[in-house]
Amino acid sequence: MDEPWWEGRVASDVHCTLREKELKLPTFRAHSPLLKSRRFFVDILTLLSRHCHLCPSARHLAIYLLDHFMDQYNITTSKQLYTVAVSCLLLASKFEDREDRVPKLEQINNTRILSSQNFSLTKKELLTTELLLLEAFSWDLCLPTPAHFLDYYLLASISQKDHHCHAWPTTCLRKTKECLKEYAHYFLEVTLQDHIFYKFQPSVVAAACVGASRICLQLSPYWTRDLQRVSSYSLEHLSTCIEILLVAYDNVLKDAVAVKSQTLAMVPGSSSAPAQVLFQPPTYPTLSQPPPTTLAQFQSPAQDLCLAYRDSLQAHRSGGLLSGDTGPSLHTPYPTLQPLDMCPVPVPASLSMQMAIAAEPRHCLTASYGSSYFSGSHMFPAGCFDS
């Protein structure tokens, strides 16, 4: 069946099943001594999956398998970690993607990504590690990730009642929806960069990606009745995750400026030119905008979005972005917030993630979300490569 599940007649039933499955997911403890290498291997798997044209759900499942396997077993060497990472990707592709897209071992070994690291995986090593992974997860790879929920929520992401900047109706629903989808998938990739997102259920992360995208596109209301009905989440429920995503977005913009400044400093007499970074915010079509407003009052686009979002969230608690009962919040309210007049925030162009197959992939984000939260001794139930 070629029809995606989220467009089928049983989409609601599949969504309910995934929501039930995510409640049984194990807790991520962040106990691996090689956790500091996680971002590097996330980049490796991202590059490999894009090189092999794998679907997002396969990439997200591969990284989920890697994270939780590292969390349970004592992986002590980079060779072991490379072996497990590649095996996770191949196993996830077999489970999530079409058969004709599953990469061959030779294809993986011949990529510049691995050959530049002097790494090669044999068929015997792959088979042994795949069996080890399957046993570690009790032969159950039906593990929901944010990628499994996102497309279902995107179906309700735009409506004819949406307004831009709280006043101007959207001019073209089709183009706006395309741009929101691009933004949402951008935020979905951002969630791979930090294990803090394991604090949230996958469906919460996916819904937050849609909410953050609507905030960046200045669509009002930030969270619609349709989105609340489809996801069963209120704006308050998603507030913490959305804010983390917007902080990450702000750091990406700052990194782009830093990369541009460093590049210009290295080339004498060079003129200003657009900087290219691993993650770039997406392009979206020109929307009807109010008269020009002085932007000097703002510190940075994402900071303004966070403040405006918090302000609207506070108004939502007193009477509502959404009419009717939105249900109890799982998060504590924000402190008293200063009102902020909304105005269009310029968003840099092009999101096409330019992840060049380089000799040594760079980390995509430099944001820190308080790693002290994941402190404690390293405890492991078993060694995964013990003879």
Curated annotation (Swiss-Prot):
- What family does this belong to? Belongs to the cyclin family. Cyclin J subfamily.
What is the protein name stated in its UniProt record? Answer: Cyclin-J-like protein
Keyword check for Repressor: no
The UniProt record lists the keyword Protein transport: no
What positions does the domain Cyclin N-terminal occupy? 13-142
Q: Which organism is it from?
A: Mus musculus
The regions listed as transmembrane in this protein's record are none
Keywords for the protein's UniProt record, in alphabetical order: Cyclin
| CDD domains noted in UniProt | CYCLIN_CCNJ-like_rpt1 (cd20528), CYCLIN_CCNJ-like_rpt2 (cd20529)
Q: Which InterPro entries does the UniProt record give? A: Cyclin (IPR039361), Cyclin-like_dom (IPR013763), Cyclin-like_sf (IPR036915), Cyclin_C-dom (IPR004367), Cyclin_N (IPR006671)
